[in-house]
C-alpha cells in the first residue's frame, strides 16, 4: 500500500459498473492510473499477482494492488494516449498492423498463463507514437458484452479462444466505427451472436461502404473474410487454433493490402498526427478533482505531528513560566518569609558535605537586621 499512501492529488477520469478510474499524482510528481473498485466487488488476485511480475511491451504495467477503505484497488502506469474508441474507424492498414502488435503482447501473456478476458476498444489505448497498449483485464466478470465470446456469457473463464473472438469484434469496430453486435441487453446481444456469419459481416461492411461511412474497397472485404471466419465463430472449437495462427492471417492480409512499405508508413504518420491533435485538445480540458478519503491521511498525519510539536513547546513554555514565577516572582513575600526561607536553605547547605575550600556563609546576623523594628 506504499503507492496509495503517497498519493497527493487525484482527478476523476471514468466511472464504470465495477470501478472508478482516477489520474493520481504521487509524492515524486509521478502520474499513475488508480482503479478503485466498488464495495463488494472482488477480482482474481492470482492474475494480478502474475501481472505485477511482468513487464510486457504493449501491456500497461500493474504496479500495486490491495484494498483501501475496504475496497479493492489497482495502481498501474498512466498511459498518455487516446482510447481506440475515439479513433475508429481507422485505416485498414493501421488496424491490421496494430492488431498484430496486440497479438504479440497477448502471446507474451499466454506464456505466463494469462488470458486478457476483456479486449474491447476502451481497453486499447494508442500512445503518442501510435503504438497500441493493452489496458485492464477481465478479472471481475465477462467483460464488455459487445466484445465477449459467447462462452463467457455462460460463465467460462477467459481463454485464448475467448480472446480470439474478442479480437475479431475489436477489428470489426476499428474498421467499421461501430460495434458488430447490436443490442443493449444481455439477451439481445446473445441473440445477435447466434446469427453471426462471415457473409452477414461482409454485407454489414458493404452497407457502410455504400453509405460512405468507411473507406474500404471490395478487395478489402475479401482479405478480411478469412479473419471473420477464424475469429467470430460462436463455437470456440470452430475458431482459429491459437494466436500464432491469427498472426499469420494478419500478416497475409496486411501484405495483400500493401504490406509494410511506404503506404503503411504514411498511414501511421497521419494516424499519429490524429492522436496528437486529440491529446492537445484534451490538455485544454480540466479534469474534475477527486477528494479521495485516503489522500488526506498523509496530510492529516503531518498536521497531527505539527500540532503535537506545537502543544509540547507550549507546555514547556508554561512550565518554565511557572518555575520562573515560583523562584523570581515572589516580590511581595514578607521579610519574615524571606528570612525563614534563607535560614532553611542555610541549614540544608550546612548538612551537606561541602568541599574544604568553600566556607559556608552565616546569614543569622543579616537576618536579624532584616527584621522590622517594633512599631513599624
PLM regions: where:
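Activation-segment/catalytic-loop signature of the eukaryotic protein kinase fold
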Residues: 65
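ATP-binding glycine-rich loop module of kinase domains
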Residues: 20, 26-42
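Conserved catalytic-loop aspartate of Hanks-type protein kinases
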Residues: 163
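Regulatory extensions appended to serine/threonine kinase catalytic cores
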Residues: 257-304
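Activation segment signature within eukaryotic-like protein kinase domains
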Residues: 98-99
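Conserved short submotifs of the Hanks-type protein kinase catalytic core
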Residues: 69-82
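Protein kinase catalytic-loop region centered on the HRD/HxD motif
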Residues: 104-114
